[in-house]
């Protein structure tokens, strides 16, 4: 890390270094295992978030929800791959999400993909979580990077408000679900669906006693499997006298539910 970085005084995003080759950025990211904490743009590396227990448990809670919902297609051609905080690359920028998911059967590309070769397909779902980072910054990253044309289909942005002493746990936690199919505002801006899953509603200060099933983010299968060939989702029947295999796609819930009660529980306990 930069010898002059004073993290206790830092305001995010924090410019760490300039004139850094992208390969060096990737090498350091892997070496220090800090995927998702910094990003690269035109040779400049900026720290955008600090690791915290609440941040990591929020990621883990959402990962668990998706894994449970898609368990019937695990290790099949209909599986959903957990890409974690894999580095993505465009001509000018390199960024990682806090987590992302890509269908096994989503085809590779000739150009415009999310890796240096341009052939790796973009994930269909990404999550971005801000704790030290501001709400405006995390939304900007989602809207100006992940949801650009040909990239992710759905994204979840989350802002966890840092607790104010003497509190030791956050009470205000807000999520926004973006989907490129959602109607935009009259001015063309994104119009994500908002969810309050903390213990206090950020809009009015009211207490929230969250219960299972009360705050659920729904991901449509058509969105999660965007770009997957139709013959993979609904394979043609074999010639007689063979019997058609079980339709695994039909075993999936539609929509895929992400119950934020369980995410809140993981964040605020122990």
What function would you assign to each model-found segment?
Residues 1-270:
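Gly/Pro/Ser/Thr-rich low-complexity, intrinsically disordered segments predominantly at protein N-termini
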């Amino acid at each position: 890390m930069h010898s002059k970085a004073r993290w206790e005084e830092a305001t995010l995003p924090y410019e760490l270094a300039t004139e850094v080759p992208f390969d060096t950025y990737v090498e350091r990211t892997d070496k220090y295992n800090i995927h998702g904490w910094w990003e690269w743009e035109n040779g400049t590396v900026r720290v955008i978030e600090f690791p915290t227990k609440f941040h990591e448990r929020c990621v883990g809670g959402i990962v668990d929800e998706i894994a449970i919902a898609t368990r019937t297609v695990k290790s099949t051609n209909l599986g959903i791959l957990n890409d974690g905080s894999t580095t993505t690359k465009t001509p000018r920028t390199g960024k990682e999400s806090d987590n992302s998911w890509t269908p096994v059967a989503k085809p590779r590309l000739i150009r415009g993909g999310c890796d240096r070769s341009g052939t790796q397909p973009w994930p269909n779902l990404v999550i971005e979580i801000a704790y030290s980072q501001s709400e405006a910054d995390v939304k900007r990253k989602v809207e100006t990077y992940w949801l650009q044309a040909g990239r992710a289909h759905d994204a979840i942005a989350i802002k966890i408000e840092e607790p104010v002493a003497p509190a030791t746990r956050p009470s205000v936690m807000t999520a926004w679900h973006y989907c490129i199919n959602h109607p935009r505002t009259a001015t063309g801006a994104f119009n994500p669906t908002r969810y309050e899953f903390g213990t206090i509603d950020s809009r009015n200060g009211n207490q929230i006693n969250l219960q299972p099933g009360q705050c659920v983010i729904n991901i449509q299968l058509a969105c999660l499997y965007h770009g997957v060939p139709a013959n993979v989702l609904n394979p043609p029947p074999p010639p007689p006298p063979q019997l058609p295999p079980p339709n695994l796609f039909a075993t999936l819930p539609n929509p895929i539910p992400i119950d934020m009660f369980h995410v809140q529980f993981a964040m605020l306990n122990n």
